[in-house]
Amino acid sequence: MSRSRDAALKVAKQARGNGAFLPFRLDVLRSPALAALSPYASKLLLDIASQWSMGKNGDASVAFEKVLRARGWRSKATLYKALKELVASGLIIQTRQGSLHECSLYALGWLAIDDCGDKLDVKRTASPLDHWRKFEVDSNNSSSTPRVPMVLKKPHLSTPRVPDG
């Protein structure tokens, strides 16, 4: 005996709870582009993704005062560094260049860009652009956190030593 489509949808909705959900594909979650993000860029990606709704991919704002300060951001410099990193990774796509009275807008790179009522600088897409697939980890890129040297202990000495290099 099989359930009807409506009953199956109702069961699926109950299983995930009543809240909205975000379509975050597993190939994106497992990608080198996502793995290489700094913690601030990862947080910003989630803050941008939290603005997503069906039919509005491309309409996410990173306005510091009106949107992101309430989400815990305290530094514009940190925000813009994380934003630059996300755009370079291809995980987000700028859909409108900001100006004096309009903020820049962004889309999630693993979803198709929607129309959003003629306020974007780019056309809607039928399928995702997936620029994040072309991301390559830069081995020459220095980490934002300094390398912490490994501390070695000699069993016959009471003080640890730090190896060279």
Question: Each predicted region: which residue ranges?
Answer:
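Positively charged, structured surface patches that bind polyanionic biopolymers
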Residues: 1-39, 55, 122-131, 136
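Pre-recognition alpha-helix immediately N-terminal to the DNA-recognition helix
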Residues: 43-47
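Short, amphipathic alpha-helical interaction segments positioned at domain boundaries
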Residues: 110-144, 148
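Intrinsically disordered, low-complexity and often Lys/Arg-enriched segments
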Residues: 1-8, 137-165
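Winged helix-turn-helix DNA-binding recognition segment
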Residues: 2-3, 31-35, 40, 51-112
